[in-house]
Regions:
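C-terminal motif of bacterial Sec signal peptides marking the signal peptidase cleavage site
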Residues: 17-20
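Extracytoplasmic ligand-binding site segments that recognize negatively charged/polar headgroups
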Residues: 47, 51-70, 112-261
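Mature extracytoplasmic/periplasmic domains
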Residues: 301-379
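Periplasmic-binding protein-like
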Residues: 146, 169, 232-240, 278-302
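Conserved C-terminal helix/tail region of periplasmic/extracytoplasmic solute-binding proteins
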Residues: 370-459
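Bacterial signal peptide processing site
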Residues: 22-24
Length: 459
């Protein structure tokens, strides 16, 4: 009997002890903001891993002696911030994702935790609404003043509490000016993507959000509608387009447009500049009906183990040196005024071979065409919405409907005359390697030019 009493006493003591531990150990997600979270009790000399999750090829990575942002952050932290955190050392663990959705899946399944992520606007909106992001005082970042006021107070983060802008860009149409009739592009319309004259030479996005958007901008439909009928109308347009397509593509577009095996495609302006640097016959315009305008921004997920260190990383990323290196490497426009006004950056951008109809250079293509100007007509169709051309997150029901429509489009009986499944798989494997090599090499070359100029300047 005594043994049972002692056993029961020990059991209850253990339960109470565990309960006490659980109650005392709060997770970062239990706090309203990063600033409310107590600093962990790091040990002096301890190496702490900061886990960063970003898009592929979306940071200056030190290849061939270029500016390595992650290594430079480690160096900066260990020299200047270590004592602030008890004498620890930082090691950046960097991993990449191909889509917002895959990143979201990784975060929600809880298998891996990350400290910094860089999702797109609509995904930030979704994750914030689901409690997957930590709030933090962006104004306390010493470099936050570098971010242009135009990129603060956005629809997805109106109070600037969950994100810091990293890069932005707009969608448009790329065409071969040597082989596409000037009269067919004079109107600057999405209709070019449906022009039967170029049957077999048109490329469409191989993802539902962007592909449907091309049809929706063309027809003046809301890209953020929850109405199934709106999406059915867009589907009809894509069904009309399908017989004249060469195929649905992702990164294969680089090789196809550069070697002139395709003549017309829709893609993002930063990537167009990469292609134009390799093929002088390529030109670009923003369709008059409206285009997608995206912002990718740095956030701290609620699963972060080191939210305070994540803030230090984000602050470093918007410093002039890191932001310029990243902007040159990525090729998209920067929301960072320290980049836009940087002389070396401007000079490097002018080295792109692109020249527009009226002598417009690469820098002007990125920065002189503001989203409000490009989307003036589309915005007028939805006067009660803020930035209606930007993608919003959908309800689960709407997303399921879109996915089903996309599957029906891809599986429809209409034959894609220029793409065959077996040969396509073989070609895709080869193209993936070629595209990766070309794309990476071109982006890095501009980073090297900036690096060399900076070395000469300080020599």
């Amino acid at each position: 009997m005594l043994k049972k009493i002692i056993s029961l006493f020990l059991f209850l003591s253990l339960v109470l002890s565990l309960a006490s531990c659980v109650g005392a150990s709060k997770k970062p997600s239990d706090y309203e903001s990063v600033e409310d979270i107590p600093l962990p009790e790091y040990k002096k000399g301890q190496t702490v891993s900061l886990k960063v999750y970003n898009w592929g090829e979306y940071i200056s990575d030190g290849s061939e002696d270029s500016f390595d942002v992650n290594k430079e952050f480690e160096k900066y932290f260990n020299e200047h911030l270590s004592e602030k955190y008890g004498g620890i050392k930082i090691k950046v663990e960097y991993s990449m994702y191909p889509t917002n959705e895959e990143m979201y899946s990784k975060i929600t399944n809880g298998a891996v935790s990350y400290d910094v992520i860089i999702p797109s606007d609509y995904m930030i909106q979704k994750m914030q609404s689901e409690g997957l992001l930590l709030s933090f005082d962006t104004g306390s970042l010493s470099n936050y003043g570098n971010i242009s006021e135009d990129f603060k107070g956005t629809y997805y983060d109106p109070d600037n509490r969950y994100s810091v802008p990293y890069t932005y860009g707009m969608l448009g149409i790329i065409y071969n000016k040597d082989k596409v009739d000037p009269e067919d592009v004079a109107d600057k319309s999405w209709a070019l993507m449906w022009n039967e004259k170029y049957s077999g030479n048109i490329l469409q996005f191989n993802n539902p959000r962007d592909a449907f958007a091309t049809a929706m901008y063309k027809e003046g439909l809301s890209v953020n509608s929850d109405d199934p009928e709106v999406w059915n109308k867009a589907l009809l347009e894509l069904q009309k387009q399908k017989p004249i397509l060469q195929g649905y593509v992702n990164d294969e577009i680089f090789n196809k447009m550069e070697n002139e095996s395709a003549l017309i495609a829709s893609y993002y302006v930063g990537d167009f500049l990469t292609m134009a640097d390799n093929q002088e016959n390529l030109a670009f315009y923003y369709p008059k009906e409206g285009v997608n305008y995206f912002i990718d921004a740095m956030c701290i997920p609620s699963c972060s183990s080191n939210p305070h260190l994540a803030k230090e990383y984000i602050n470093f990323m918007i410093s002039e040196e890191a932001a310029v290196a990243n902007a040159l490497y990525i090729g998209y426009a920067s929301p960072n005024t320290a980049v836009v006004e940087n002389e070396e950056y401007i000079e490097a951008m002018l080295e792109y071979s692109y020249e527009g109809e009226n002598g417009e250079n690469a820098y002007e293509l990125l920065y002189n065409n503001t989203p409000d100007t490009v989307n003036a007509y589309y915005n007028s169709l939805f006067p009660d919405e803020i930035d209606p051309a930007c993608y919003r997150s959908f309800s689960d029901e709407t997303q399921k409907n879109i996915n089903a429509l996309w599957e029906s489009l891809k599986k429809s009986s209409t034959t894609e005359p220029w793409i065959h499944v077996v040969s396509g798989l073989i070609v895709a494997s080869v193209l993936t390697l070629e595209v990766y090599s070309t794309y990476t090499k071109k982006k890095r070359s501009h980073s090297y030019r900036l690096r060399d100029k900076q070395k000469k300047k300080t020599a």
